């Protein structure tokens, strides 16, 4: 999913403009130094994960996460702050390359999403890069979600003009993994993604199906 054209809020329907402007009234978004917000970043991350289904909710070690922030030096990090309380409600980090920006992560407190935090975060990023979009530069939100049940890419497409850039999926298995996949492939429909193991197996089967469909 990519954004390779300038963003124009005036081209949106009135309802979508309202949602974006609502978020701007409630939150300030700016680039931050993550080392100055370790505790808040961890709190936002954990609040966001609590809203995920347990079957693929990650387990996060607080100390390891806070220490990992030391390695964010080459990332561009945005923070979304509540205008009333000044509390960090969302963060996003991205990595910039010569021809594109990798939209890696966006995490938000669920109770802030109703007030438009996600829209405000995305708009702030688009506005910062708007002059470069369409000039051999684009924002990449990554591949289609397989394991994670999310409508975020649909949201980016509908509200912000992102588009699907189709590509071919190729998978290189280790020999023993390939043997397992081949063995369980005929029984793939019995694997239900209702726990962590089932979710992983179901995801592999979905990717294998994508590969087979492209070959036919």
Q: Which role does the model predict for each range below?
A:
Residues 2-20, 24-113, 123, 128-130:
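A conserved beta-strand-loop-helix scaffold within acyl/acetyltransferase catalytic domains
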Residues 1-7, 132, 136-216:
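Active-site/acyl-donor-binding loops of N-acyltransferases
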Residues 13-17, 67-77, 91-102, 119, ...:
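Hydrophobic transmembrane alpha-helix bundles
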Residues 97-159:
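Glycine/small-residue-rich hydrophobic helix-like segments
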